[in-house]
Amino acid sequence: MNRSLALLLIIFFGVFSHAQFLTTSGKQILDKNGDPIILRGVGLGGWMLQEPYMMNFVGGADNQQQFRSKLESLIGETNTQEFYDNWLDNFVTKTDIDSIASWGFNSVRLPMHYNLFTLPIEQEDPGQNTWLDKGFEIVDNLLEWCKDNQLYLILDLHAAPGGQGYDQGISDYDTSKPSLWESDANKQKMVALWDKLAERYKNEEWIGGYDILNEPNWNLSGSEIRNLYVQVTNAIRSHDTNHIIFIEGNWFANDYTGLTPPWDDNMVYSFHKYWNVNTQNTIQWVLDMRNQYNVPLWMGESGENSNAWFKEAISLFEDNDIGWAWWPWKRIETTVSSLSITSNSNYNAVVEYFKGNASEEHTV
């Protein structure tokens, strides 16, 4: 084989390999065929992380840890574990993913709780990472369902080690322990988790990318959040140069102080938008950022509103070539998500007991 032909083959297969993955080019996200794509997705909130409002236990527990602790005190550790095992096995199934695809979506965002992948720092020696099978099994199964339906799966670290914000419910933050930002050990564990995930999924073309931290909300300097994000990026890139890295700003993905310019050439800025009006000026700040830094945008989370608001928001995003992911796919007793879970008297009794509105004898 002559050198010119060999070089052409290297270029061809290199381009072909790169085009198999969701990637970026200037201000656009490109699909596996290299064509511009608008991501239209849903977030699977409430599955791997139970936020109080989604479970209807606001006033009964501030976060998942409190809810689980109270449940253990009421029904015991064995029964509580059985509840969580059944929850994880049944909250999202292949039927959900089949439905998401059949309804016209092309992507899914998976909010992950770190404690399904590794132990808290309080339960390990310094620097140790004990890997747990459950989290990886959930991602593996979900990825297979997404492959079957040709949906891109975006991994989202929703609850980081220690919790990344003052809002306890969003990240399962325990105020009695150091947060992500107050503990080098928690930061190291977060980096190690993304290192592990990137190593495992580096060759998976239906992984759409890595949303490395959901909605941080903490008094931070721009350099503090950037330094952690760069560490995570470096860990990912040590294994995986294929996948997009999605970056959320501080204060619920709306403050990008210190996070510009981009430090990676396959990066997307992911903002969130809730409740404000759907006019051009409400997103002009992110459009300006896109234009200044020649980087794509993704509206990675919005919802909890009326159908009229949803329609206006989607029109606004798509008129500006911005993909979106709706939140959430389902939750208990609601009219503002795609699906609503019908509660039952036993669950309602437990919640009312946690809120102090019922006695134990009328609950168990």
Label every PLM stretch briefly:
Residues 1-20:
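Bacterial Sec-dependent N-terminal signal peptides
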Residues 21-22, 182-332, 336-352:
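Extracellular glycoside hydrolase catalytic/binding regions
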